[in-house]
Amino acid sequence: MPISKTLPYNAIEQIKSYLLQLQNTICVSLESIDGKTRFHEDSWQRAAGGGGKTRIMANGNVFEKAGVNFSHVSGEQLPASASAHREELAGRHFSALGVSLVIHPQNPYVPTTHANVRFFVAEKEDSEPVWWFGGGFDLTPYYGFVEDCEHWHQTALNACLPFGETIYPKFKRWCDDYFFIKHRNEARGIGGLFFDDYNEISFDHSFELMRSIGDHFILAYEPIVARRKDIPFGNREKAFQNYRRGRYAEFNLVYDRGTLFGLQSGGRTESILMSLPPIVHWEYNWHPEKGSDEEKLYTDFLPAKDWLKKE
């Protein structure tokens, strides 16, 4: 007998409860790491339906800017970014819940990171609801360390293994493909996990997978921050960090599905654009010095690779 993909009557309540708990857990952990600054919470309502809680930290000891956003929005019609390739969604009203975060550190030796877990459901009278989960986490170093990349991907693998051996390679490859800046012909970072439109086996199975990925994020990021946050740096490293942040801004404004969905669905602009770095620098036709640590980011870390392959 096949396992049903029927949506439980209290699915939204289950997911919302988990997401709020995840937001709080991550914020408490980041406050503990920073040791100086606490998150400011900004609750907001969306006129077309729903709302959220945006938490922002700025000018901390460790984190220059960190945003952890919970949103639960609804509407009568999905925006183009969510329905362009799914004709069955036409004419359905939707609910979308998620936690999305971006962390921009002070120290250039600490990587920037992004994570997101989300749920969509599109419903229509006299029809089965169409639902799916999505999310992932990815790492954007400025100065690469092999042990950090290996730890990041090992933790990503650990999040996926309970659901089968094929999940991590699939989601890892998806992440490498998704976070690629086409107009620059380079990756945004060293990847991690990315998945979308996931509703395999059953609701419970899919929800458990999303929770596992959400719960493993801080386990992946916290040890890297602890190792790198006190490394001395100077103007050169800070300038390179600000230059590379430009790539981050370019990707988010041109390609990111979450940004496009939020703006097209009439979301809250301040919360949607919280992912942008506080300071960014563009320099015309800049190239790193040969043999420098900055060049190694491009040659040794940004090209997609299997970080867990044992030689």
Swiss-Prot record:
The record marks H183 as: Important for dimerization. It comes from the Bacteria. Pathway: Porphyrin-containing compound metabolism; protoporphyrin-IX biosynthesis; protoporphyrinogen-IX from coproporphyrinogen-III (O2 route): step 1/1. Its main location: cytoplasm. One of its GO terms (biological process) is protoporphyrinogen IX biosynthetic process. A divalent metal cation binds at H104, H114, H153, H183. The active site is at H114 (proton donor). It catalyses: coproporphyrinogen III + O2 + 2 H(+) = protoporphyrinogen IX + 2 CO2 + 2 H2O. One of its GO terms (molecular function) is metal ion binding. It is found in: Cytoplasm. InterPro entries: Coprogen_oxidase_aer (IPR001260), Coprogen_oxidase_aer_sf (IPR036406), Coprogen_oxidase_CS (IPR018375). Keywords: Cytoplasm, Heme biosynthesis, Metal-binding, Oxidoreductase, Porphyrin biosynthesis. Homodimer. Involved in the heme biosynthesis. Catalyzes the aerobic oxidative decarboxylation of propionate groups of rings A and B of coproporphyrinogen-III to yield the vinyl groups in protoporphyrinogen-IX. This is Oxygen-dependent coproporphyrinogen-III oxidase. It comes from Legionella pneumophila subsp. pneumophila (strain Philadelphia 1 / ATCC 33152 / DSM 7513).
